[in-house]
Amino acid sequence: MKTYRRQIREKILQALYTLELRDTDIDSAAGWLLTPEILADPKAMKFFNLLLGNIKEHMEEIDRYIAAHTFNWDMSRIAIIDKNILRMAMAELLYCDDIPPKVSINEAIEIAKKFSSTDKSSKFVNGILDAIFNALKEEGKINKNGRGLIDHTPPRAAKTDAKS
């Protein structure tokens, strides 16, 4: 049976949530959540390990990006689920070269709709990720290849210039 990346993202989100609430390490938290279906699928495990590894390895950097774009929010005030959805999407944007940015952002929004406690969470996640993505794109920090290539539409300023 084919496992889908969203299921894996949801398991990673649950592991990150567990990590915030329990005295455990991320690998143990993630291990409890893996289904036999995911464990039996080499591609699923590769994606799981890649995404989880990038979140673990780059958590401080990811948190700095989030903090820089949540102007009126201290990281400790962001709901645990929302913060971890942002972390996961940021790890995909920055370190998963084959995933298009729009997919990462859309997946984060859909997961926020499913797991967050308020209707506003998906809008919050969307706004923060959109702002971070645009900043990263302008800074040339989004490096995608293969299926992950970003569309090559001109920046917003260039679009308005083209209309004149």
Curated annotation (Swiss-Prot):
| Gene Ontology biological-process entries | DNA-templated transcription termination; transcription antitermination
Q: Which UniProt keywords apply?
A: RNA-binding, Transcription, Transcription antitermination, Transcription regulation
Instruction: Give GO cellular component annotations, separated by semicolons.
Output: cytosol
Pfam name, any one: NusB
Respond yes or no to whether keyword Ribosomal protein is given for this record. Answer: no
Region span, Disordered = 144-164
Recorded hits in InterPro entries, A to Z, give: NusB-like_sf (IPR035926), NusB_fam (IPR011605), NusB_RsmB_TIM44 (IPR006027)
Sequence ranges of Basic and acidic residues compositional bias: 149-164
GO MF: RNA binding
Query: What function is annotated for this protein?
Result: Involved in transcription antitermination. Required for transcription of ribosomal RNA (rRNA) genes. Binds specifically to the boxA antiterminator sequence of the ribosomal RNA (rrn) operons.
Q: Return the protein name.
A: Transcription antitermination protein NusB
What gene is this protein a product of? nusB
